[in-house]
């Protein structure tokens, strides 16, 4: 019985590896995905604030998509705040690849907002970030790790994608945001 419990514990810890630990760099932080399509898939989802957002609604605007999960805290939330601190108030869609989570999108957004708070003093509130389901979009794109970040340009084309360790760099965020906004 002890061996079975140990095996379950080890398997559980492997499932959460990379989403609860330190900010260590991934082995290959530049995207290692099979073949990423050139265009981001069409999507239409209900967000944490009860509004519908879609690729059609964002047509003509660049935006960023962070594929995450409600249980992914440290690296995913650090990434969210790096993006906010670099280019605040831009449209960022935080898409959950976990369709079975018991954590609501609203609670997830509140938790991400509070991630960088100093005690009772709130810092950033990620007001232009929308938290929504994105498991189908993640499957279409072959996303396998939380924190995968995709920059989408004004015409819906993917201009850059990578893991959270690569995207968690202010210079890269600014450079890729500028590229996504080129005409």
Task: Name the predicted role of every residue range.
Residues 59-64, 88-93, 126-128, 145-147, ...:
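Loop/turn elements at helix/coil->beta-strand transitions in domains of secreted/extracellular proteins
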Residues 66-70, 95-99, 132-136, 153-154, ...:
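Active-site-proximal beta-strand/loop segments in catalytic clefts of secreted hydrolases
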Residues 74-120, 136-140:
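Structural microenvironment flanking redox-active thiols in thiol-disulfide oxidoreductases
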Residues 110-154:
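Short, internal strand/loop/helix patches
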Residues 22-55:
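N-terminal "domain-start" segment that seeds a small globular fold
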Residues 52-77, 93:
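Short active-site neighborhood of thiol/selenol oxidoreductases, capturing the structured segment around
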Residues 1-32:
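Secretory targeting signatures
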Residues 145-183:
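Thiol-/selenol-based redox modules, centered on thioredoxin-like
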């Amino acid at each position: 019985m002890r061996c079975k419990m140990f095996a379950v514990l080890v398997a559980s810890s492997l499932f959460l590896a990379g989403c609860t630990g330190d900010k260590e760099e991934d082995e290959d932080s530049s995207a290692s995905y099979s073949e990423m399509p050139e265009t981001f898939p069409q999507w239409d989802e209900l967000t944490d604030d009860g509004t519908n957002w879609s690729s059609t609604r964002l047509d003509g605007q660049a935006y960023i998509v962070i594929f995450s999960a409600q249980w992914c805290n440290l690296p995913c939330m650090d990434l969210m705040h790096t993006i906010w601190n670099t280019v605040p108030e831009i449209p960022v869609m935080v898409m959950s690849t976990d369709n079975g989570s018991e954590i609501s999108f609203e609670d997830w957004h509140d938790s991400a907002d509070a991630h960088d708070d100093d005690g009772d003093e709130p810092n950033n509130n990620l007001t232009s970030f929308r938290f929504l389901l994105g498991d189908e979009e993640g499957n279409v794109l072959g996303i396998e790790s939380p924190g995968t970040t995709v920059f989408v340009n004004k015409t819906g084309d993917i201009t850059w994608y990578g893991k959270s360790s690569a995207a968690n760099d202010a210079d890269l965020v600014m450079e890729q945001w500028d590229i996504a906004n080129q005409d």
